[in-house]
Amino acid sequence: MATIKVDVVSAEEQIFSGQAKFVALPGEAGELGILPGHTPLITRIRPGAVRIESENGEEEFVFVAGGILEVQPGAVTVLADTAIRGKDLDEAKAEQARKRAEEALQNTGSNLEYATAQAELAYATAQLAAIQRLRKLRGQH
């Protein structure tokens, strides 16, 4: 079966590098699904889960906090602002971050503080959604 080279990197480290049959991720205009031979594309990505289906059918999940996606016919590169392997996501920390961001929204004094709190809330909410999605796919409740 045809595969595509996938690299997911953040400013800190390379998170994933390998061959895949399929990649799904949250693009700026909606969910994107990428197969080998996909039309070249460059777009921004939103915070959320990147799902990588490997050659042997196993799935790898990576949470990204936004970034840039580059697609070439034989390669997919995700340049993430921040990336966390699915197995390393911490639901308790994400929930605390969501609560802090909601509190900050209530207590903002300037437009900049409000925008920062909104971005933090979107990040925490996307991380919690990725955790729930991963748990559902693994059959955990």
Curated annotation (Swiss-Prot):
What Pfam families would the database entry show? ATP-synt_DE, ATP-synt_DE_N
One GO term describing the cellular component? proton-transporting ATP synthase complex
Which keywords belong to this entry? ATP synthesis, Cell inner membrane, Cell membrane, CF(1), Hydrogen ion transport, Ion transport, Membrane, Transport
Tell me what topology the record assigns in the membrane.
Peripheral membrane protein
Chief localisation class: membrane
User: What PANTHER family does this protein's entry cite?
Assistant: ATP SYNTHASE DELTA/EPSILON CHAIN, ATP SYNTHASE EPSILON CHAIN, CHLOROPLASTIC
Which protein family is named in the record? Answer: Belongs to the ATPase epsilon chain family.
Q: What HAMAP family does UniProt report for this protein, alphabetically?
A: ATP_synth_epsil_bac
Kindly provide the name given to this protein in its UniProt entry.
Answer: ATP synthase epsilon chain
Organism in which the protein naturally occurs: Paraburkholderia phymatum (strain DSM 17167 / CIP 108236 / LMG 21445 / STM815)
As recorded in Swiss-Prot or TrEMBL, the protein's gene is named atpC
